Amino acid sequence: MPKKILFTGGGTVGHVTLNLILIPKFIKDGWEVHYIGDKNGIEHIEIEKSGLDVTFHAIATGKLRRYFSWQNLADVFKVALGLLQSLFIVAKLRPQALFSKGGFVSVPPVVAAKLLGKPVFIHESDRSMGLANKIAYKFATTMYTTFEQEDQLSKVKHLGAVTKVFKDANQMPESTQLEAVKEYFSRDLKTLLFIGGSAGAHVFNQFISDHPELKQRYNIINITGDPHLNELSSHLYRVDYVTDLYQPLIAMADLVVTRGGSNTLFELLAMAKLHLIVPLGKEASRGDQLENATYFEKRGYAKQLQEPDLTLHNFDQAMADLFEHQADYEATMLATKEIQSPDFFYDLLRADISSAIKEK
């Protein structure tokens, strides 16, 4: 009988990416892989799109809020139902372990696995824990973290960032689509790539639309999240979504303008790619992106510009400063010790699962 592992995590792409890195490795080693999530969530879309041999189990989900809302009353019942569904799934499958990447959907499966005596491993990417992982930590066997955490968190293993980016641009798959884009770009201009993520692309889209003069100063690549904006014209490539082109576009850019999500930031760090961070503020997030951006700026990896300050004048100043000190930023990024390979983390996780099973 094959070993079984349950994955969970969702709500944003960032809560799915690491799972999609690990899952093929478990499948290759003969594990039967199952995933618990929201059937209407990004996790279901990404699992389906991956084509991986994964059985998806849908549960009811409710948002966990730090503030009062009448929706909390309805969501209490959704979370309770999700817990009952998770208990049934875990009891039926009897997996060796559960791995969670976080997000609201992950809490019921984590609690269910713990109640049924299954080892629970969770991962936190941000400088500070989100509410879902604060709850999940209480039920976890081990929590792996990208950033160092408080000393009193005894179950934490500081890992660093796990990425699968190609550091060598020559390793990346060739793309006829990319060659077509280059035909519209000028070799005399710097190329900027704007990555807004699922929650933050709109501001970048509007900034580019409001300032057509940017196209006279730079080649612009804009990942918009909106298919209605798709365009390929002189000095401008707007595309709603990319997969295979993602890393080649980063490699093609001289500088990346990004939000403050930790997954993207550490991918840029791994590629030693010059970048400007415009983090989501507390009105659009819990403040984790502000913390991530400040961390990267203090480490000398990047420069940050707050969203309310995103004017053309301030943007031009930030570009000038980054390009003037490009060599210093790149040298600092190349010297980082904060990046781990997927194989390293997979081996560590497998070893920890084995140890947890033996200790039961």
From Swiss-Prot:
<comment type="pathway">
    <text>Cell wall biogenesis; peptidoglycan biosynthesis.</text>
</comment>
<keyword id="KW-0131">Cell cycle</keyword>
<dbReference type="GO" id="GO:0009252">
    <property type="term" value="P:peptidoglycan biosynthetic process"/>
</dbReference>
<comment type="similarity">
    <text>Belongs to the glycosyltransferase 28 family. MurG subfamily.</text>
</comment>
<keyword id="KW-0328">Glycosyltransferase</keyword>
<dbReference type="GO" id="GO:0030259">
    <property type="term" value="P:lipid glycosylation"/>
</dbReference>
<dbReference type="GO" id="GO:0071555">
    <property type="term" value="P:cell wall organization"/>
</dbReference>
<feature type="binding site">
    <location>
        <position position="289"/>
    </location>
    <ligand>
        <name>UDP-N-acetyl-alpha-D-glucosamine</name>
    </ligand>
</feature>
<keyword id="KW-0472">Membrane</keyword>
<keyword id="KW-0808">Transferase</keyword>
<keyword id="KW-0573">Peptidoglycan synthesis</keyword>
<dbReference type="InterPro" id="IPR004276">
    <property type="entry name" value="GlycoTrans_28_N"/>
</dbReference>
<dbReference type="InterPro" id="IPR006009">
    <property type="entry name" value="GlcNAc_MurG"/>
</dbReference>
<keyword id="KW-1003">Cell membrane</keyword>
<keyword id="KW-0961">Cell wall biogenesis/degradation</keyword>
<dbReference type="GO" id="GO:0005975">
    <property type="term" value="P:carbohydrate metabolic process"/>
</dbReference>
<dbReference type="Pfam" id="PF04101">
    <property type="entry name" value="Glyco_tran_28_C"/>
</dbReference>
<dbReference type="GO" id="GO:0008360">
    <property type="term" value="P:regulation of cell shape"/>
</dbReference>
<comment type="function">
    <text>Cell wall formation. Catalyzes the transfer of a GlcNAc subunit on undecaprenyl-pyrophosphoryl-MurNAc-pentapeptide (lipid intermediate I) to form undecaprenyl-pyrophosphoryl-MurNAc-(pentapeptide)GlcNAc (lipid intermediate II).</text>
</comment>
<dbReference type="GO" id="GO:0050511">
    <property type="term" value="F:undecaprenyldiphospho-muramoylpentapeptide beta-N-acetylglucosaminyltransferase activity"/>
</dbReference>
<keyword id="KW-0132">Cell division</keyword>
<dbReference type="GO" id="GO:0051301">
    <property type="term" value="P:cell division"/>
</dbReference>
<feature type="binding site">
    <location>
        <position position="198"/>
    </location>
    <ligand>
        <name>UDP-N-acetyl-alpha-D-glucosamine</name>
    </ligand>
</feature>
<dbReference type="Pfam" id="PF03033">
    <property type="entry name" value="Glyco_transf_28"/>
</dbReference>
<protein>
    <recommendedName>
        <fullName>UDP-N-acetylglucosamine--N-acetylmuramyl-(pentapeptide) pyrophosphoryl-undecaprenol N-acetylglucosamine transferase</fullName>
        <ecNumber>2.4.1.227</ecNumber>
    </recommendedName>
</protein>
<dbReference type="GO" id="GO:0005886">
    <property type="term" value="C:plasma membrane"/>
</dbReference>
<dbReference type="InterPro" id="IPR007235">
    <property type="entry name" value="Glyco_trans_28_C"/>
</dbReference>
<keyword id="KW-0133">Cell shape</keyword>
